[in-house]
């Protein structure tokens, strides 16, 4: 493994229809990835893909915070647990789950309920927490401080400023194992706040991701994103951290192996 995409959606269109094309590129650049669920249906697809390509893909299963009002809580909890029990060896994380206050705060209590349910599943089964946090970093800091997870926590699509980075880094003082997954946003010219934050985040806490098919990095902005475009994220992170690209690749792969590919 030379590259790792910690968070992609090969289980979603338009990637799913052209997955063989992407898998060929996985092999070409020696890439592995997490295929991330956002609801029960595409979590099941993520598992099927991980079973079909076990040397390249792991599945993460969960309910996105923006979808919590669309599903039945008890039924979803039961089905998530069943999906996990029947496919444990192919699943790396619970998620993406978390809090999203960007569009509305109407479903805060429901997001809390689904967070606690998925948090418990991850902790009980010793799985990584793949967190989606948008406009809710004070909330996640408070809840992680209170719950003190024993399993690693990934801040998916971390694109915040240095102040939020410092606050989240302080969770290390509570012996919480945290990682910052950096998306293609880092390649954007207007991402200076993220660049400054990256400078203070230790490399041993970094992962790379695409969140494909969204958040396409430069030089492909405006087009569909693919997991193989993670190479552009890694090279940009290396430049910002003033580390050779080969060394940055080695560090990120080491972090990924620690979490997912033992």
Curated annotation (Swiss-Prot):
Q: Which family does the entry's similarity section mention?
A: Belongs to the metallo-dependent hydrolases superfamily. TatD-type hydrolase family.
Q: Which cofactor does it need?
A: a divalent metal cation
Q: Report the co-factor binding details.
A: Binds 2 divalent metal cations per subunit.
What EC designation does it have? Answer: 3.1.-.-
Q: Which Pfam families match?
A: TatD_DNase
- Recorded source organism is Mycoplasma genitalium (strain ATCC 33530 / DSM 19775 / NCTC 10195 / G37) (Mycoplasmoides genitalium)
Binding positions for a divalent metal cation 1 per the UniProt entry: 7, 9, 96, 211
Q: What cellular component terms from Gene Ontology apply here?
A: cytosol
GO MF, one annotated term = DNA nuclease activity
According to its UniProt record, this protein's enzyme class is hydrolase
Which residues are a divalent metal cation 2-binding? 96, 132, 156
| Name used for this protein in its record | Uncharacterized metal-dependent hydrolase MG009
Alphabetical UniProt keywords: Hydrolase, Metal-binding
């Amino acid at each position: 493994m030379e590259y790792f995409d910690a968070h992609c959606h090969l289980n979603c269109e338009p990637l799913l229809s052209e997955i063989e094309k992407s898998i060929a590129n996985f092999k070409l650049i020696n890439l592995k990835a997490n295929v991330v669920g956002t609801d029960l249906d595409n979590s099941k697809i993520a598992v099927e893909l991980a079973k079909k390509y076990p040397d390249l893909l792991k599945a993460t299963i969960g309910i996105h915070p923006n979808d919590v009002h669309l599903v039945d809580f008890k039924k979803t909890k039961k089905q998530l647990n069943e999906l996990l029990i029947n496919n444990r060896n192919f699943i790396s994380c619970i998620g993406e789950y978390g809090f999203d206050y960007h569009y509305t705060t109407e479903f805060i209590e429901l997001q809390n309920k689904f967070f606690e349910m998925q948090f418990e599943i991850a902790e009980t089964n010793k799985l990584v927490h793949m967190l989606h946090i948008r406009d809710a970093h004070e909330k996640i800091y408070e809840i992680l401080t209170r719950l003190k997870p024993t399993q690693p926590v990934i801040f998916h699509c971390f694109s915040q400023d240095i102040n939020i980075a410092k606050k989240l880094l302080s969770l290390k003082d509570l012996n919480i194992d945290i990682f910052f997954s950096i998306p293609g946003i880092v390649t954007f010219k207007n991402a200076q706040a993220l660049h400054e934050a990256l400078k203070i985040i230790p490399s041993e806490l970094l992962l790379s991701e695409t969140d494909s098919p969204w958040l396409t990095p430069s030089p492909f902005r405006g087009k569909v994103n693919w997991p193989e475009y993670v190479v552009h994220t890694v090279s940009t992170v290396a430049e910002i951290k003033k580390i050779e690209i080969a060394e940055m690749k080695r560090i990120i792969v080491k972090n990924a192996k620690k979490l997912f590919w033992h």
